Amino acid sequence: YSDERLPFKGELNRLETNYDRLRLQLFQESPVYDSLLDNDLFPEFSNSFLLLIGREKPEIATVYSKFSNERSPEFSLRTDICKEGKKDRFVRKVPTEATAEKHVRNLESLSREMARIYAKEGLELNQCTLEKQGVRLEFLRGKTLEEHLDALVEQGRNEEAEKLLFRYVEKVRRIHSGEAFYKTPEFVKVFGNVSQEGTLSCSGISNIDLVPANILIDNDRISVIDYEWTFRFPIPGNFIIYRMIHYYLESDGKRRALK
């Protein structure tokens, strides 16, 4: 994070952060983080700081950086929000290991393939272009579906939150209802030889991380902002819906009211 990109309320809700030393864990960390953010105290409680000193100011400044390096090396990457002079911001994803280059560069072709499928349900993808180091994506503004749901829950409008969530669940269901699911060797390699009961629906290409935090709403524009975990083989649509509901409800204790 930086002064130009501090965390949003509700963003700090995970406990498995790679801290540099042992720390005490609170019973309800998310409300504590939200309280710190409301009172502009986040810098006072930050874990560590990075200070860059040099004679020349870089043309492209990094205002936020996230390392996803707890994964296997072939998926390890860094996500930056960058600012180029007075121009608008953009997002850059670069591999942190040579073996992850294929995974990162694959995003550009995935964005084109998924855009055609999602357009049927009024969903867009943030545009992705190849760069020398990795890929460059649009920096989009708006509020995530997760933020909209949280606002309703905090106001006690649980029925409205449920209707909003399931409006998007049905979009996902329709996207993944064009084909009958069957296990491919690629599916078994990733998910194992799981048992199958009954007939399941799917599509030929599947983004399993289509969760509320990755759906951005800006007036009439609805965008999917992270499609890194997309596979070019059939995956049951019900599994994607399960992840969508599970990762929203289980990521923050305040959402238990919807269970």
Q: Where are the language model's segments positioned?
A:
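Catalytic activation segment of kinase domains across protein kinase-like and atypical kinase folds
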Residues: 189-256
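Rossmann-like AdoMet/SAM-dependent catalytic core
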Residues: 2-80
